[in-house]
Amino acid sequence: GDFLSLKHDARLTEFSVDVHRSDFYMAVLRVVVYQTDKEHKVFTPLLKEPIYIEVFPSGEPQTFSRKISVFVPKGEAWVGIQFVEMRGKDYDRFFFPSTINTCYIRFTDGKIRPLNKRLGIPFSVKGYDYIVVNE
């Protein structure tokens, strides 16, 4: 995943991720959105219901988009994907296109580390600022 620094409250409306190739006969990813503190020690989930992406085998690139509606308070947030389930043979592979942008992994102990020295998994998030205007 990656961190967002928001100057205003925001509403996230769409999440998209590309998969370059999947050999697994079933792979399930989960979209995650957390509010976090500046030190990235505390993560509070913002999605009320889980959003899953089912990836079926294909040697061709695929793009998966999901409509979402998530209110994110101003400050720091973390958006990413988690692997939920992978079914296949021992030699099956799952490929994302990569970027040179930093991508972070959140481990079960809560620690955050960059993935492979500036190797990232690209995804996109659409949304808009949520500003209340007094009349």
Predicted regions and their residues:
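Eukaryote-biased detector of low-complexity, proline/serine/threonine-rich segments
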Residues: 70-76
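Exposed aromatic-hydrophobic patches
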Residues: 60-70
